[in-house]
C-alpha cells in the first residue's frame, strides 16, 4: 500500500513497522509488528506479495513464513531442507515464482548438501507490480 515500511531486526528477533509518508519520504516511529521465539531462528530477508502479505526468511530455522501484517497473523509456513535461509524474492515473467536464497559454509555442506542453493517454489500468489525509479 506504500504506507508502511517493514524492517527486519534480526538481533531482536522482530519485524518493525514504520508509517511511511510517500509524498514527503518520512517515517513515523517504529512499532514491533512481530516478535519471534528463539525456536523460529532469526528473521532475515523479506519480501511482500501482491496481496500485501510479508514473506520472511528464517535463518537457523529452515523455513519461510507468510504473514498477514494487518492482522499480525501467520498464514503459512514452508519448510526447507536447509537451516540457513537468508532471503526471498518474487520473479519470473508473471512474478509467480518465489526464489529463496540460502547460505553455506564448510561445516554445513556435509549434513545439508543443499546448503547454499537457491530454491524456487510456486506459492500460489504473485509478487507486486514492479516499481520503476524515475531517476534524479
Please annotate each region the language model reported:
Residues 13-16, 62-64, 106-108, 118:
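Structural signal for beta-propeller blades
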